[in-house]
Amino acid sequence: LECHNQQSSQTPTTTGCSGGENNCYKKEWRDNRGYRTERGCGCPSVKKGIGINCCTTDRCNN
């Protein structure tokens, strides 16, 4: 599986997921600098107030 892994509004980059990982995620939240976005492999649990979208196809998390 190939997932996007750039932060916030950086130029899109991708990474190959290892260990049989079959999810990509896009996590979004707001802090004192504005809206933040994190992307990567897996589907982590998140704290209240953080939005997450997990998906299972190549580059689905942009």
Swiss-Prot record:
Gene Ontology MF: a single term: ion channel regulator activity
Which keywords accompany this UniProt record? Acetylcholine receptor inhibiting toxin, Disulfide bond, Ion channel impairing toxin, Neurotoxin, Postsynaptic neurotoxin, Secreted, Toxin
Listed CDD domains = TFP_snake_toxin
Write out the ranges of the annotated region (Disordered). Answer: 1-23
Q: Which Gene3D superfamilies match?
A: CD59 (2.10.60.10)
Regions of biased composition (Polar residues) lie at: 1-16
CC per GO annotation = extracellular region
Q: Which residues form a coiled coil?
A: none
Its annotated compartments are: Secreted
Tissue localization of expression: Expressed by the venom gland.
Q: List the disulfide bonds.
A: C3-C24, C17-C41, C43-C54, C55-C60
User: Which Pfam family is an annotated match for this chain, by its short name?
Assistant: Toxin_cobra-type
Q: What does this gene product do?
A: Binds to muscle nicotinic acetylcholine receptor (nAChR) and inhibit acetylcholine from binding to the receptor, thereby impairing neuromuscular transmission.
**Family statement drawn from the similarity comment of this UniProt entry:** Belongs to the three-finger toxin family. Short-chain subfamily. Type I alpha-neurotoxin sub-subfamily.
| Identification of the protein by name | Cobrotoxin II
Please report the organism this UniProt entry assigns to the protein. Naja kaouthia (Monocled cobra)
Lineage, opening ranks? Eukaryota, Metazoa, Chordata, Craniata, Vertebrata
